[in-house]
Amino acid sequence: MKKTILFLLAFISVSVSAADFTVTSATIKNGSTLTNKHVFNGFGCTGENVSPALKWENAPAGTKSFAVTIYDPDAPTGSGWWHWTVVNIPANVTELKEGASSKALPKGAVEGRTDFGKPGFGGACPPQGDKPHKYIITVYALKTDKLDVNGEASGALVGYNIGFATLAKASITATFSRPAAK
């Protein structure tokens, strides 16, 4: 009888454990192809360059801030391509509205420089005719309320700082490609 009760208590404690940290988007579904709304406008691309809506939940205990990155590991650079980095998002914020980049970010949030050379969001823009590229959108729960980076920080520098402060992360991935030039 005691063994049965202990087993049931152990099972119940596992079942009641915290839910996983997750991210979703009303504008980009996991595994989908990006629409023109989230494609860069420049560099040979003619998209609307609008940052996606993101919502996250079940951050772990001890979360003091959040960071968001969008990264293309398939860019033919040898080091991928950073499309968006946002840090110092307050712990009480659990979403970014579509188009938040540069105009509607939470107070204190900082956008780093994309690999297009400017701070803010830079949408997808793979080379024409290249295979579909993956765009990994990640929200990080951080154990610090502020990372010491500014708007001139590269994606690599932001990623380095995020790496030392991460409690948990959640990602969704989308793809995009452009037809070969005629």
Q: Residues of each region from the PLM?
A:
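Sec-dependent N-terminal signal peptides
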Residues: 4-14
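N-terminus-centered regions that define maturation/targeting leaders and the start
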Residues: 18-182
